[in-house]
Amino acid sequence: MAPNGTASSFCLDSTACKITITVVLAVLILITVAGNVVVCLAVGLNRRLRNLTNCFIVSLAITDLLLGLLVLPFSAIYQLSCKWSFGKVFCNIYTSLDVMLCTASILNLFMISLDRYCAVMDPLRYPVLVTPVRVAISLVLIWVISITLSFLSIHLGWNSRNETSKGNHTTSKCKVQVNEVYGLVDGLVTFYLPLLIMCITYYRIFKVARDQAKRINHISSWKAATIREHKATVTLAAVMGAFIICWFPYFTAFVYRGLRGDDAINEVLEAIVLWLGYANSALNPILYAALNRDFRTGYQQLFCCRLANRNSHKTSLRSNASQLSRTQSREPRQQEEKPLKLQVWSGTEVTAPQGATDR
């Protein structure tokens, strides 16, 4: 999800420091991959999570998952080895994937904020405004725009500082070049403008939600639904807040590097703000679990279903064996007096009184 930049490699002289950084980066990658896999599986298992809003959340989780699988491992290797060892061609692919995933993440968060805005500002028309077809079109546009902006700009050299150097690769470095125009345009289009719109939408959402809560506080039937809706909004706002905290320092450094030169930022500082941005991909699943009850339920179902199924199977086997033993030991007269149980489609059992079968 790193936008238009890759891991800045700085050499670590201390062995202990290098081991510590290796462990931290490995844990971050593991949490990113595992956490976003859990998000996708939870939505698949829990029907309450299968709604249009969560389509964008799943898209965001897929983006972060791809980041953890396709970008972060190579960023960590580059960070720790202090050199790029995978060649020029793969450097261009790697940086293009990095930019694409960042753009997709921002656009997903942007669409989530618009979805929440429609749900709170005009709840009666929400089913008309947000339809499955429109959501599908939005998701397709998110990925088409992301692919176009990333691969097109890098492979055509729009980010380069001179006409002769259109690549992103030197002998030992793999780093996207940033010129003045590219730094300003990309920073505004992919981060600052979406961030501004999201802040405005969430401000209006919270303002309307607060006014509605005051007006309908005495109506219990509306109160429960409103509380659930507001909790979902708070959760999504927390996700966006984490995104701002994680990525704002990097984009500030990115624009500054475009204005002042590729070497204007200290490599240590650049690496810190970059990996702070990467950490956002690991935070999103944690935020869902901490703030959203439906996601907590989905996580519980995911982690407990296999254990529950295993225990249920063992219990069923013991019950069947016990029932068979009792049946074989009963006398025929006792079997005839056994109450009749009628199984209905609703899943409940209706027990007939003894002797009902004799009538």
From Swiss-Prot:
Keywords assigned: Cell membrane, Disulfide bond, G-protein coupled receptor, Glycoprotein, Lipoprotein, Membrane, Palmitate, Receptor, Transducer, Transmembrane, Transmembrane helix
Chief location bin: membrane
Chain's role: The H2 subclass of histamine receptors mediates gastric acid secretion. Also appears to regulate gastrointestinal motility and intestinal secretion. Possible role in regulating cell growth and differentiation. The activity of this receptor is mediated by G proteins which activate adenylyl cyclase and, through a separate G protein-dependent mechanism, the phosphoinositide/protein kinase (PKC) signaling pathway.
Sites annotated Essential for histamine binding: D98
Extra facts: Antagonists for this receptor have proven to be effective therapy for acid peptic disorders of the gastrointestinal tract. Certain antagonists are used in the treatment of neuropsychiatric and neurological diseases such as schizophrenia, Alzheimer disease and Parkinson disease.
Residues exposed to the Cytoplasmic side: 45-57, 115-134, 205-234, 290-359
Name of the featured protein: Histamine H2 receptor
Lipid attachment, kind S-palmitoyl cysteine: C305
Entry membrane topology: Multi-pass membrane protein
Glycan attachment points: N4
Species whose genome carries this gene: Homo sapiens
Localization per record: Cell membrane
Any Gene Ontology CC annotation: plasma membrane
TM region positions: 23-44, 58-81, 93-114, 135-159, 181-204, 235-258, 268-289
InterPro entries xref list: GPCR_Rhodpsn, GPCR_Rhodpsn_7TM, Histamine_H2_rcpt
Marked site (Implicated in histamine binding) residue numbers: T190
UniProt biased composition (Basic and acidic residues): 328-340
Disulfide feature: C91-C174
Cited PROSITE patterns: G_PROTEIN_RECEP_F1_1, G_PROTEIN_RECEP_F1_2
